[in-house]
Swiss-Prot record:
Pfam family of the protein (one): 2-ph_phosp
Lineage: Bacteria, Bacillati, Cyanobacteriota, Cyanophyceae, Synechococcales
NCBIfam families linked to this entry: PRK00886.1-5 (NF002056)
The species this protein was found in: Synechococcus sp. (strain JA-3-3Ab)
Family: Belongs to the ComB family.
Cofactors required: Mg(2+)
Family annotation (InterPro entries): ComB-like, ComB-like_sf
Name the UniProt record assigns to this protein: Probable 2-phosphosulfolactate phosphatase
């Protein structure tokens, strides 16, 4: 297995398709997608823009859909849910189709949707993702961070490094310098992941919006909180991996 890390979807090569791609947005889209599916949501359908989301949601029964939206770390006005994983309780989301659009993570998923196998990873479902990759024995895997509006995000690269560390990758399996750096970053911070999230620019951004968002950072920093792997089952639609 050869593994490559790309800090943002904009860095993904325009040519070449790997066997598997892993989308990462620790703060908070891929954490929240895992939380939604673990809580019993029927599926999460992702959109880069709000207009497409609203148009698609109208074809779904009103009693079986929830609109989830975030821009700049804040819930979209008029939507049912934001991007806090703590909102996605079984009482709220069980058997619901979640129509979701976020600032960064949903854009990453749309960039990767042509790849044969697409899953999402976060720190909270690290172990489940690593086991999925081991079972799949994919020849080439891309670990793609979402970043923040096209820029590097510390927490996404740390999560990519966590995947590489847990897989026990040899140096020969690390396909680019970004993968080497991701592994080194995670190994430096592995005993203080909450501290890393608090120090990250997006963590600081969320805390500036509300100190209560520190509870989200704590949620997102906890390894192996969830044992689910969200997998793309059709373009833009994620459900539990079989």
């Amino acid at each position: 297995m050869q593994l490559f890390h790309f800090h943002t979807p904009e860095q993904v090569p325009p040519a070449g398709i790997p066997a598997c791609a892993v989308a990462i947005d620790v703060l908070r889209a891929t954490t929240t997608i895992a939380a939604a599916l673990a809580a019993g949501a029927e599926a999460v359908e992702v959109f880069a823009d709000l207009q497409s989301l609203q148009a698609a949601s109208r074809s779904w029964p009103a009693s079986k859909r929830l609109l989830a939206g975030e821009r700049g770390g804040k819930t979209v006005t008029g939507f049912d849910l934001g991007n806090s994983p703590r909102e996605y309780t079984p009482e709220r989301v069980r058997d619901q189709r979640i129509f979701m659009s976020t600032t960064n993570g949903t854009r990453t998923l749309q960039r990767l949707e042509r790849i044969p196998v697409v899953i999402t990873a976060a720190l909270v479902n690290l172990g489940a993702v690593v086991e999925f990759l081991r079972r799949g024995a994919f020849a080439e895997v891309w670990l793609v961070g979402s970043g923040w509006e096209g820029a590097f995000a510390l927490e996404d690269t740390a999560c990519a490094g966590a995947v590489l560390h847990r897989l026990g990758c040899s140096w020969e399996q690390l396909g680019n310098d970004e993968a080497v750096a991701a592994l080194a970053l995670y190994q430096t911070w592995q005993d203080n992941l909450l501290g890393l999230l608090r120090r990250s620019s997006h963590g600081q951004r969320l805390l500036a919006i509300s100190p209560e968002n520190d509870s989200d950072l704590a949620y997102c920093a906890k390894l192996d909180r969830l044992s689910v792997v969200p997998q793309q089952v059709q373009p833009g639609v994620l459900a539990l991996a079989g």
